[in-house]
Amino acid sequence: MLYVKNLHKSYQSGNKSYSVLKGINLSVADQEFVAVMGPSGSGKSTLLNCISCYIPFEQGTITLGNKELKGLDETALAKVRNEKLGFVFQDFMLLDGLTIRENILVPKIIQGKVDQEAEKLADKLLSLFG
């Protein structure tokens, strides 16, 4: 389970501070798909970058399972990003020469962890789209 509690992020421009995320709260169950939607400049990418700890945030907590992500060293964060978090961005990004199923499995292929469980999950995801 992913929990985001009271997340705040702002950016500085000159003498001004711009609050982009103000008290964001959300929870996402294991294997749940969530769409983050909004107009350009609304903070969608900032939220995802905070969740993955690519950028710092001023206030709040992000917990995955029983681990708070803020404060993990880069090695531990890389492991979390590779094994526990996944993002699909709005740009169409399939790899030419691979089937859709193989594209779904790309992260597992890179990790060298294509197993029966990963293949079943890929098939399940494909069945959602017919």
Describe the role of every protein-language-model region:
Residues 67-68, 105, 116-130:
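Conserved ABC ATPase "signature" region
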Residues 97-107:
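Short coil-to-helix segment of the ABC ATPase nucleotide-binding domain corresponding to the Q-loop/switch region
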Residues 37-39:
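The feature captures the beta-strand-to-loop junction immediately N-terminal to the Walker
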Residues 60-71:
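Conserved ABC transporter NBD signature motif
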Residues 52:
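Helix-to-loop junction immediately C-terminal to a conserved catalytic motif
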Residues 4-7, 19-29, 60:
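Conserved beta-strand
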Residues 69-86:
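ABC ATPase NBD coupling module
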Residues 1, 10-23, 73:
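A short, flexible loop at the N-terminus of ABC-type nucleotide-binding domains that lies
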